């Protein structure tokens, strides 16, 4: 959530940064208009309250000075006091309604792109930062798409999964299930060694949690919801892990806090009809290891670069070619102020595909979720900065392995770092 003070003090800057996302999509003037009304009411209420207090003192003084408690003078003051009390009572719901309107409009505004984020309208204007692993790209021809080699090996079952659920689901069989488990354990082990503390959070989460990280109210149609409870299936571990600290004041000396978490993730993929209808790239249910950070504002830029490096380390250990993109303003996620995407090489399509997004949300999520910190010896509190990134999406990592490690004889080599987990060299 954006700070209303920022909108008041720098309306032109805020509107320009929002327009950098999508011109004309977001307007702050309606919020500022309501804010003026709300502050005017606050001023009226303060004046009325001051007069009410003054009347109370006057009545006491006059009675103490000998005035008749039932006399006309005291009655007049009491009548004015009662009139003020009624006005205050009438103002309360008006002020409450204005605050609610402002809050809801602020919830609908995305984060401001960082000044360093390149300005652009869509993904075609993202900026490539670097590539890694060109020497690891496979040279053999006729590489099958991962879903074909997976079905040939009997480790990916799509057709029967439709019978169990619907399209965009998969069952992993035999070595496929073992590979998924190996990837999860390997990724967690690597991130724990890098200083992250593992969490196994709930995967059913409430609306307040989704609001705290920015999925609600704007993206309700993209998540699965339980019919009879205020519970949703988590779209990413970012949501429950971030909200573990909702409405808490942390000690500055305990920052930064690093967490890693494996969870299944659930997404309706609304608006993706016809895209990636085959394979593991776009499923309704998939597994992911997520990295979440809570950091001091002064270190968040450096922590962001370290987060990207933590995600890259997994791809490098697996020797999977990838590239890093800095997202332009028009392609940023709703809550992100700055974001890097890691894209892994899929040789069957001769292209790179996203496997991790590493975002710095600055104080946007913390302001929505009420996550603050206090520094010893200083008054007041500040909002923490939150960051998160995939480390990595398991299904997409499996897809990349099935293609990049494909052998001419129809087998798939197991990456060396996974062999101790799988106890085999080939699938």
UniProtKB/Swiss-Prot annotation:
L-serine binds at residues 236-238, 290, 390. GO terms for molecular function: ATP binding; serine-tRNA ligase activity. One of its GO terms (cellular component) is cytoplasm. It catalyses: tRNA(Ser) + L-serine + ATP = L-seryl-tRNA(Ser) + AMP + diphosphate + H(+); tRNA(Sec) + L-serine + ATP = L-seryl-tRNA(Sec) + AMP + diphosphate + H(+). GO terms for biological process: selenocysteine biosynthetic process; seryl-tRNA aminoacylation. It is found in: Cytoplasm. Keywords: Aminoacyl-tRNA synthetase, ATP-binding, Cytoplasm, Ligase, Nucleotide-binding, Protein biosynthesis. The keyword RNA-binding does not apply. The keyword Membrane does not apply. ATP binds at residues 267-269, 354-357. Its EC number is 6.1.1.11. Coiled coil: none annotated. Pathway: Aminoacyl-tRNA biosynthesis; selenocysteinyl-tRNA(Sec) biosynthesis; L-seryl-tRNA(Sec) from L-serine and tRNA(Sec): step 1/1. NCBIfam families: serS. Belongs to the class-II aminoacyl-tRNA synthetase family. Type-1 seryl-tRNA synthetase subfamily. Catalyzes the attachment of serine to tRNA(Ser). Is also able to aminoacylate tRNA(Sec) with serine, to form the misacylated tRNA L-seryl-tRNA(Sec), which will be further converted into selenocysteinyl-tRNA(Sec). Homodimer. The tRNA molecule binds across the dimer. PANTHER family: SERINE--TRNA LIGASE, SERYL-TRNA SYNTHETASE. Consists of two distinct domains, a catalytic core and a N-terminal extension that is involved in tRNA binding. This is Serine--tRNA ligase. It comes from Picosynechococcus sp. (strain ATCC 27264 / PCC 7002 / PR-6). The lineage of its organism: Bacteria, Bacillati, Cyanobacteriota, Cyanophyceae, Oscillatoriophycideae.
């Amino acid at each position: 959530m954006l700070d209303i003070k920022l909108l008041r003090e720098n309306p032109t800057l805020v509107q320009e940064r929002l327009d950098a996302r999508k011109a004309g999509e977001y307007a702050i003037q309606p919020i500022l208009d309501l804010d003026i009304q709300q502050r005017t009411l606050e001023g009226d209420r303060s004046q009325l309250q001051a007069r009410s207090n003054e009347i109370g003192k006057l009545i006491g003084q006059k009675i103490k000075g000998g005035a008749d408690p039932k006399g006309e003078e005291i009655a007049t003051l009491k009548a004015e006091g009662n009139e003020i009390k009624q006005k205050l009572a009438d103002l309360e719901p008006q002020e409450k309604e204005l605050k609610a309107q402002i809050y809801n409009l602020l919830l609908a505004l995305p984060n401001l792109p960082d000044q360093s984020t390149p300005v652009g309208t869509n993904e075609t204007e993202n900026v490539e930062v670097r590539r890694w692993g060109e020497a690891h790209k496979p040279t053999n021809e006729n590489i099958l798409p991962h879903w074909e080699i997976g079905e040939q090996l009997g480790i990916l079952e799509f057709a029967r999964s439709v019978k169990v659920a619907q399209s965009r689901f998969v069952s992993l069989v035999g070595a496929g299930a073992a590979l998924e488990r190996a990837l999860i354990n390997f990724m967690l082990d690597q991130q724990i060694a890098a200083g992250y503390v593992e969490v196994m959070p709930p995967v059913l989460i409430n609306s307040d949690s989704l609001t705290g990280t920015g999925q609600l109210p704007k993206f309700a149609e993209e998540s699965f919801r339980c019919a009879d409870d205020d519970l949703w299936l988590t779209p990413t571990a970012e949501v429950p892990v971030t909200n573990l600290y909702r409405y808490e004041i942390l000690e500055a000396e305990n920052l930064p806090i690093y967490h890693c978490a494996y969870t299944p993730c659930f997404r309706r993929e609304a608006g993706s009809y016809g895209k990636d209808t085959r394979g593991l790239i776009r499923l309704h249910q998939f597994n992911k290891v997520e990295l979440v950070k809570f950091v001091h504002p002064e270190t968040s830029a450096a922590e962001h670069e370290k987060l990207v490096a933590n995600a890259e380390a997994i791809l490098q250990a697996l020797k999977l070619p990838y590239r890093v993109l800095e997202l332009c303003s028009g392609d940023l996620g709703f809550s992100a102020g700055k974001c890097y995407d890691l894209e892994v090489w899929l040789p069957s399509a001769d292209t790179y595909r996203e496997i991790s997004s590493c975002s710095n949300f600055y104080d946007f999520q913390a302001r929505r979720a009420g996550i603050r910190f206090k520094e010893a010896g200083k008054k007041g509190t500040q909002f923490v900065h939150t960051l998160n990134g995939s480390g990595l999406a398991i299904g997409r990592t499996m897809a990349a392995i099935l293609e990049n490690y494909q052998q001419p004889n129809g087998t798939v080599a197991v990456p060396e770092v996974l062999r101790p987990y799988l106890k085999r060299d080939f699938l």
